[in-house]
Amino acid sequence: MASSTKVSLRRPPRPQVMYSLKPKVVEFDKVWVQLRPSIIDIINLRPITNVQWHHKFSDVYDICVSIPTPLSERLYNEVKACIQEHVRQKRQDIVDVDPDLLLQEYHKMWRVFHEGAIFIHRLFGYLNKQFVKQKRCTDLDNFAQYAAFLQIPDVKEIGCLALEIWKEDLVKTILPQLVKLLLIAIDNDRKGNFPHIANEVSGVINSFVKMEETDFDVVPAEGARYKARESTTAFYQESFEKPLLTDTEQYYSALAQKMLTDLSCSEYMEQVIVLLEQEEMRAKKYLHESSVEKVITLCQKVMIKAHKDKLHAVCHDLITNEENKDLRNMYRLLKPIQAGLSVMVKEFEEYVKKKGLEAVSRLTGENVPQQFVENVLRVYNKFNDMKTAVFMDDGEFSSGLDKALQGVVNSKEPGQSVPKASERLARYTDGLLKKSTKGLSETDLEAKLDSAIVIFRYIEDKDIFQKFYSKMLANRLIASTSISMDAEELMINKLKQACGYEFTSKLSRMFTDIGLSQELSNNFDKHIADIKTVQPDVKFVPTQTMILQAGSWPLNAPQLSTNSNNQTAQDVANFHLPRILQPVIQEFEKFYTGKHNGRKLTWLFNMSQGDVRLTYLDKQYVAQMYVYQMAALLCFERRDAILVKDIGEEIGVSGDYLLKTIRTILDVTLLTCDDQNLTADSLVRLNMSMTSKRMKFRLQAPQVNKAVEKEQEAVANTVSQDRKYYMECAIVRIMKTRKVLKHNALVTEIMDQTKGRFSPDVPFIKKSIEDLIEKMYIQRTDQNDEYQYLA
């Protein structure tokens, strides 16, 4: 029997044309007597020769095309009766089998019958094509005989017919016994008593699907025999899947209750993960692929979803204690559950924010910006690693981490109206990009700039950062204290990637101005050289001039300030440029206006510096100082001692700024004064015995009042005004596009447009809308909370 089965499982050779295709008269009974035994042999997988196969194939063809009337329908009915008789015999055989051997015997019978049905289907291929398919088409032709068609029994192709008979006449009679034995086998597998008939269990279960195959004409790829055939799972689902799911739910519900009683939460989670993995492997081993997800979802429902409150109850402690292993297990279990992670995400977010606020509170010392950035980065790196390792970079936890750090970075200190993060980050980057004795490699510098961008993305008031950063960049560029122009450009490109071109457009123009200024200075030097060629006695102090666009640089000339509260502007309003600088300044103005007629130059003497060579001392020193300091020191060219007020009258500087200027010169001991407190009546002397370890040194800029606080106030005022203009422009752009818009919709679009620069509050938005209504850019409509654009 084994030998014959092995032979019959090979695909039979395709029939060759060995017979006449011409229709002829056929004696049905005579042909059928010879055909019927072959059907039984084939369906039992008994071997037949090629000649026999071709003869039987020819017999089927002859019957289907016989004259004067084709005998297809009679052949179909006889084949059906033959298969029914065969299946009834098999049913009797299986009924008599020992119950303990039922699965094995059924599986053996099924394998033979299923394979035999496939070959029978091929043998009767012409009958399927000529009778079955044509009958279906003609019965439905134009729906003319639709009512009659409803009374005709379903005509199936031979392969489908054989499986239908198997299902109806055999399987359904023993289905309860089969299902019971299958469930027992799976239950034993769950308990560790692995059945020795695993292949038979899987084969019987999948027979419930295969017996509903509908397409026997598909030729599967080699190594994937018959898997490509279409089938439905209705019978499988109703007869086996339903009882299986019921049994599974009962089993794991009871098991979950027992484990919760006997195990800790940590142990419970570990055990559930193991059970889920085992059940998934078991489902893939035994069940149809459509059942795998259903079984796992059901297990998750009874072991996780039903008890998620118990898991949530310990979540706070696990996160607070940073029990990463348990948290990873909890994440794996709750991830597939709808809204299962909400509590974990909330606890994670709150814990990160708590640790972050602790890290940035009570910062003291001179390096607060560096402490702030490094502490925030420490928190970010720690919990970003935790998010990756524990929560698999899950989007919900990424969002929670971002919200937490946004809350940390934008937190306000007591008594502060705006967060300090923007200023601190700007000062931190200023420290990185300034020349210093502690050099960084290009790789280290870029890594630190990348870290700064991480924090920058969390800052809500990006416009405040922009103001501070542009001021500090301007100082670096003017004073030539940048570590390198490549590093400056690298940072600007990173800001551009984070916020777009508009955010960095002014910063880029500052770079352009520096390049153009260098070219202009070179041309001016050539111009001076040409003058000296003609007039050798003319003396010009060597200079390097920067031409800076007023709209791009965050700089102001104090002498032109219209702010009545600006005391510095009043103190330097009548400043007299030193005579030694006047020729070159006048010549440069003449040179520049000759090339750029119509442009106006405003000198920023408060930012202008020069080198003064000191030749009256034992050694020749070079002091780098600001123009106001230079003017004051030059007063001592003809005198050794002068009253402070006389210096002020001579250089045109007065008030507190004059005192600050003199004090900076006293600080480096170029001048001396006997008075403890410097006043306008104090007498200052030139220090003829001054010494310094450095041959070249720099004087500090005069500090007017509290410079940092003044800078913060100036930035706050500028930002407030810029926000007002930006907000009004955004509203006008939106309304010009929309024409008519509801209040809430307008607020939403405003928030979306401004989020890249700052986060406006609702009162500020409302005030901006009211201002535009007064200016008649928009108006209210007759509808409630609706605005209309006015062209």
Curated annotation (Swiss-Prot):
Pfam families noted in UniProt: Cullin, Cullin_Nedd8
Expressing tissues: In adults, highly expressed in meiotic cells and oocytes. In larvae, expressed in many proliferating cell types: P cells during the L1 stage; seam cells when they divide at every molt; vulval and somatic gonad cells in late L3 and L4 stages; and intestinal cells throughout larval development.
Every Cullin neddylation domain range: 722-784
Pathway listed: Protein modification; protein ubiquitination
SUPFAM superfamilies per record: Cullin homology domain, Cullin repeat-like, Winged helix' DNA-binding domain
Gene Ontology CC annotation, any one: nucleus
Superkingdom field: Eukaryota
Cross-link (Glycyl lysine isopeptide (Lys-Gly) (interchain with G-Cter in NEDD8)): K736
PTM comment, free text: Neddylated; which enhances the ubiquitination activity of CBC (Cul2-ElonginB-ElonginC) E3 ubiquitin-protein ligase complexes.
Entry's localization field: Cytoplasm; Nucleus
Keywords for the protein's UniProt record, in alphabetical order: Cell cycle, Cell division, Cytoplasm, Developmental protein, DNA condensation, Isopeptide bond, Mitosis, Nucleus, Ubl conjugation, Ubl conjugation pathway
Subunit composition and interactions: Component of multiple CBC (Cul2-ElonginB-ElonginC) E3 ubiquitin-protein ligase complexes formed of cul-2, elb-1, elc-1, rbx-1 and a variable substrate recognition component. Component of the CBC(fem-1) E3 ubiquitin-protein ligase complex with fem-1, fem-2 and fem-3. The CBC(fem-1) complex interacts with tra-1 and promotes tra-1 degradation. Probable component of the CBC(lrr-1) E3 ubiquitin-protein ligase complex incuding cul-2, elb-1, elc-1, rbx-1 and lrr-1.
Protein's job: Core component of multiple cullin-RING-based CBC (Cul2-ElonginB-ElonginC) E3 ubiquitin-protein ligase complexes which mediate the ubiquitination and subsequent proteasomal degradation of target proteins. As a scaffold protein may contribute to catalysis through positioning of the substrate and the ubiquitin-conjugating enzyme. The functional specificity of the CBC complex depends on the variable substrate recognition component. May function in ubiquitin-mediated degradation of CKIs to target cki-1 for degradation.
Recorded family membership: Belongs to the cullin family.
UniProt name for this protein: Cullin-2
